[in-house]
Swiss-Prot record:
Entry similarity comment: Belongs to the tryptophan dimethylallyltransferase family.
Presence of the UniProt keyword Manganese in the record: no
An example molecular function term from Gene Ontology annotations: prenyltransferase activity
Binding site for dimethylallyl diphosphate: R105, K192, Y194, Y268, Q353, Y355, Y419, Y423
Entry function: 12-alpha,13-alpha-dihydroxyfumitremorgin C prenyltransferase; part of the gene cluster that mediates the biosynthesis of fumitremorgins, indole alkaloids that carry not only intriguing chemical structures, but also interesting biological and pharmacological activities. The biosynthesis of fumitremorgin-type alkaloids begins by condensation of the two amino acids L-tryptophan and L-proline to brevianamide F, catalyzed by the non-ribosomal peptide synthetase ftmA.
Binding site for substrate: E94
Protein name: 12-alpha,13-alpha-dihydroxyfumitremorgin C prenyltransferase
EC class (word): transferase
Keyword set includes Aminoacyl-tRNA synthetase: no
Record pathway: Mycotoxin biosynthesis
Enzyme Commission number: 2.5.1.110
Gene that produces this protein: ftmPT2
UniProt keyword annotations, A-Z: Prenyltransferase, Transferase, Virulence
A biological-process GO annotation: fumitremorgin B biosynthetic process
Length: 427
């Protein structure tokens, strides 16, 4: 008698296998699972995940993420009780696909009824619970850096009380302080945390840029002084953390939840001036990185992507749009640009990653541009199938008439390879 060492099931049954006897304590959780499960499975298949890895990925979504997604959004019903920083529409869930390494990623903001009801006004409880459970599931997840930045970038109980008393009523957007992301790779998971110090800034009077840089400095990592210096110089960051150019705004810190010696730090900004010259300055650190051949190679590919997308240049006045769920962005809406730089004690210059946000652009045009870029990169299989893949994720819409499916595209270049991720609307 042969005993099988692993369970396999037909691909089409991976979702049904977990769904058949699943139980959820609320209708919201059931609806989140029924919507996100098939969506994730399609993306996993297209990213060529082995069949044996698909069920564990779905199981993690069902058991750990879905319970923390809060109220399921419904068009025409009351606005979501919590406006998340994760997506343009405040929905706390986003799928993306790293096309070079075929890695699927879920970005999300863990929520609970405490945050949605206002009891946990700055949503500190659910992210803490969720990340602790993640760490219990995989021993490669290390929370040392997470705890450090929690301490320095989240509002204290005293600051919460002051904000609720002195700054009321607070805007519905921007109250969230931390979000998470999980990536499925090599049969396991990796996790990242993101800290938004906007509320800490409001409570302390210190700029987000200063709060982030001070928290990094307190790590006392040898070798970080030089890359931080180059970042400060490029962005014109003054001692108070404010850039000399008011169109640029530091707003976010990203950190890998792994052992501290391997954990990367990412410093994020938005830029209200969207132009190729700004992109090139951010990529080259105003020319400082041009001595590195990889900088020029990456810049040339980034220019091709920029030209293909044909993003209109200009100043963006609307940093935080207040769109009603289920309503497409106005045809003339154009988002800001984003960038981050990875700070490492092992590298003289921080590595850039550019985010070209495409919300508001016609999806058919965006898909044509991406397909053309895949051909430039030699990704011929993806180029020939990409439109069909996206149509399977979002059945029904006419992409010549939609402008919200593709949230954005990020580009970086490391080890002589382009790293391209595409971000999709959750609905």
């Amino acid at each position: 008698m042969t005993i099988p060492t692993e369970i396999s099931c037909p691909e089409e049954d991976a979702f049904q296998l977990l769904d058949k006897f699943s139980w959820f304590p609320s209708d919201d959780q059931r609806r989140w699972w029924e919507y996100t499960g098939p969506y994730l499975l399609k993306l996993l298949r297209d990213a060529k995940y082995p069949q044996k890895d698909q069920v564990p990925c779905l199981y993690l979504l069902q058991q750990l993420l879905v319970p923390y997604l809060g109220t399921f959004p419904v068009v025409g019903q009351a606005p979501l009780p919590w406006w998340s920083n994760v997506t343009t529409y405040g929905v706390p869930f986003e799928l993306s696909w790293n096309l070079l390494h075929n890695i699927v990623r879920i970005g999300f903001e863990p929520l609970s009824h405490l945050a949605e009801s206002g009891v946990d006004a700055f949503n500190k409880t659910a992210p803490e619970e969720c990340v602790s459970r993640l760490a219990c599931l995989d021993n490669t997840i290390d929370l040392a850096r997470f705890r450090h930045f929690q301490h320095h970038l989240l509002v204290t109980p005293e600051e919460e009380t002051w904000l609720l008393k002195e700054k009321a009523p607070l805007a519905k957007s921007g109250r969230g302080q931390q979000t998470l992301a999980v990536e499925f790779q090599n049969g396991g998971i990796s996790a990242k945390a993101y800290f938004f110090p906007g509320m800490k800034s409001l409570a302390t009077g210190l700029s987000p840029g200063k709060l982030i840089l001070d928290s990094i400095e307190r790590l006392a990592l040898p070798g970080l002084k030089e890359p931080v210096h180059h970042l400060r110089s490029t962005l014109g960051l003054q001692d108070d953390g404010h850039p000399t150019d008011t169109a640029i705004a530091p707003f976010l810190l990203g950190v890998d939840l792994c052992t501290p010696e391997r954990s990367r730090l990412k410093f994020y900004v938005t830029d209200q001036v969207v132009s190729w010259d700004r992109v090139a300055d951010m990529w080259t650190l105003r020319g400082k990185r041009l001595e590195d051949p990889q900088c020029a190679d990456g810049l040339a590919l980034l220019r091709k992507l920029w030209d293909l997308l044909a993003i209109p240049e200009g100043y963006r006045s609307n940093i935080r749009p207040d769109f009603a769920f289920g309503t497409p962005p106005p045809e003339d809406y154009r988002p800001v640009m984003m960038a981050n730089w990875t700070l490492s004690p092992k590298k003289k210059f921080p590595d850039p990653q550019i985010y070209l946000l495409t919300v508001g652009m016609n999806d058919a045009v965006v898909m044509d541009a991406l397909v053309a870029f895949y051909e430039v990169l030699g990704w011929t299989d993806l180029a020939s199938t990409y439109k069909d893949k996206v149509a399977s994720y979002f059945p029904g819409p006419d992409f010549t008439k939609t402008n919200y499916i593709h949230s954005g595209v990020s580009f970086s270049y490391r080890h002589s390879k382009p790293y391209l991720s595409v971000y999709y609307s959750p609905f």
